[in-house]
Amino acid sequence: MSEQQPQGAEQALDLNNELQSRREKLAALRENGIAFPNDFRRDTTSDKLHAAYGDKDNEELEALGVEVTVAGRMMTRRIMGKASFVTLQDVGGRIQLYVARDDLAEGVYNEEFKKWDLGDILGARGKLFKTKTGELSIHCTELRLLTKALRPLPDKFHGLADQETRYRQRYLDLIANDESRKTFQVRSQIMAAMRNFMVERGFMEVETPMMQVIPGGASARPFVTHHNALDIDMYLRIAPELYLKRLVVGGFERVFEINRNFRNEGVSPRHNPEFTMMELYMAYADYKDLIELTESLFRTLTQNVLGNTQVQYGDEVFDFGKPFVKLTMTEAIKKYRPETDLADLADMGKAVAIAESIGIKVEKSWGLGRVVTEIFEEVAESHLIQPTFITEYPAEVSPLARRNDVNPEITDRFEFFIGGREIGNGFSELNDAEDQAQRFADQANAKDAGDDEAMFYDEDYVTALEHGLPPTAGLGIGIDRMVMLFTNSHTIRDVILFPAMRPQK
């Protein structure tokens, strides 16, 4: 007898009865003693067993006589009279249990085991063997119920199809979907590998405030909260940049932080209001040094985490083993809109005409640099499929970046693109306190004119710069988007364990 859970309308009809049955079983467990025991200890996991013994035949396993103790969730059960097969799922994967009535303590098989339900958490002890079909299994001599599940598994174990449920009840998604578990395991591996990469290069990991009196470090609308004890409004940080650069002023010459940022903006397949970034700052370096570091970082991560510098994403293959493409912003516009006369991009009137001709609504507050940037985003960004660095961003859209020595209208800045989306942003840092003060003033004027994403004037940060910031370069990398690429995920919600969702009514 193979157990299957009812589907569709039948499942809805039977759910209340099943919930009642499970609660009655729990009540019986309470009457008989400890309903949720915590004295069972496992000594291995399924993945370790498959790795160590998966290639051995049954004769070898019998000769070895390997006894193991495992624990996990019962995903399937096939009862065949006096014996049963169970699929047990743990953090490493799945292992099959062979459960025979005569091998367990008296009464366990009929009075306990057969009354358990799919989804229950079990502990098992026994010896390894191979079935006639060659499946590695555990011949159980002890079997215990560790946790009674009061609700049934979603759609047996073939997957949880409803997207809303996957995001709202991520625990069900992780139980039901192998790919989801794999995605978040890869995410963890990426973050660990990033930390190793940075520490090996002399960077120190630090933590900076998540709540700030003045939000800064990026152009975005912040979340506002109130600090009751201080009786002041505060902001969830939109970026850690200005605090990290204060640390460089203080003498920590190589720092990085991996943490969440918050931006009170729209939700899309690429945007979540709460997201994870790594930011780093390196003294006595410029943006060209960070281009080299970024290329090395991604090549190292793909090789160490995925085992290959080629990454499959949909129909595309991103090759991190080859030198990355490098284009200036205007070169990218010319490449993907060949009819563009580059001289027109230096003329406000002509640049506005180009922007409007491709459907961009030009705001009165925009200067030439903002217009050119909008043109780039419209005509070129989606075409930047292979790993690409775009350089020479206008100073107007780069209020914290150092001006170029030859052309002060542009900055020593780059953005890094893969698959038509921005993954990273880096630049030589502006360390001229007077220039920074003027740019903050320009941003404040833009905010007064209605730009709610313009930066606040941070007087304390200007004071820090007046004490002297060494020549420094900084880089920010969006980890969520990186994980999307590495796991072939097409929405950011698939790589964030608990994404922002509208509350259910």
Curated annotation (Swiss-Prot):
**Gene3D superfamilies under this entry?**
Bira Bifunctional Protein, Domain 2 (3.30.930.10), Nucleic acid-binding proteins (2.40.50.140)
Q: Mostly located where?
A: cytoplasm
Task: Enumerate the residues binding Mg(2+) 2.
Answer: 422
Judging by the UniProt lineage, the source's domain of life is: Bacteria
Keywords noted in UniProt: Aminoacyl-tRNA synthetase, ATP-binding, Cytoplasm, Ligase, Magnesium, Metal-binding, Nucleotide-binding, Protein biosynthesis
Q: What Enzyme Commission number(s) apply to this enzyme?
A: 6.1.1.6
Mind telling me which CDD domains this protein's record contains?
LysRS_core, LysRS_N
Recite the UniProt cofactor note for this protein. Answer: Binds 3 Mg(2+) ions per subunit.
Q: Which cofactor does it need?
A: Mg(2+)
Q: Which GO terms describe its molecular function?
A: ATP binding; lysine-tRNA ligase activity; magnesium ion binding; tRNA binding
Name the enzyme group at the top EC level: ligase
Q: Where in the cell is it found?
A: Cytoplasm
Under the heading PANTHER family, the entry gives: LYSINE--TRNA LIGASE, CHLOROPLASTIC_MITOCHONDRIAL, LYSYL-TRNA SYNTHETASE
The entry assigns this protein to a family as follows: Belongs to the class-II aminoacyl-tRNA synthetase family.
Task: Fill in the subunit field for this protein.
Answer: Homodimer.
> What protein does this entry describe?
Lysine--tRNA ligase
**What organism, scientifically named, is this protein from?**
Serratia proteamaculans (strain 568)
**Chain's gene name:** lysS
